Amino acid sequence: MSNSNNDSRRRGLEMERRAADWLASHGLRLVDANQHARRGEIDLIMRDGDTLVFIEVRHRRDARHGHPFETVTAAKQRRLIGAARFYLHRNGLSCACRFDVVGVTGTPPHLSFEWIRSAFDAF
């Protein structure tokens, strides 16, 4: 893997960690992170009460190239849904679920977080 890919992956993991901390400060509890399935990857899996929340974290340094939410396309949503179904099946879970998206803008330590609960429907 090239250095730029390693740097991008490292930055992505850092933003996911920061988003998990931010969401925890808003009452969610981390269950799992970076879950891979054949159809995609789930950045964060958290609990909001009895609801299992699959969370996509998107980061942009600034809005010059669009808002982070704009990168969650219909194709990306389908991959997330497939990965979530695999996760539920693999873990024998049957519970209320939702898909959230967290947009992170800026560079540390000046980050702005935006959170869309129930960003799209799946089940």
Swiss-Prot record:
| Entry-linked InterPro entries | Restrct_endonuc-II-like, tRNA_endonuc-like_dom_sf, UPF0102_YraN-like
Provide a Gene Ontology MF annotation, just one: nucleic acid binding
Q: What family classification does the UniProt entry report for this protein?
A: Belongs to the UPF0102 family.
For this entry, the protein name equals: UPF0102 protein Csal_2201
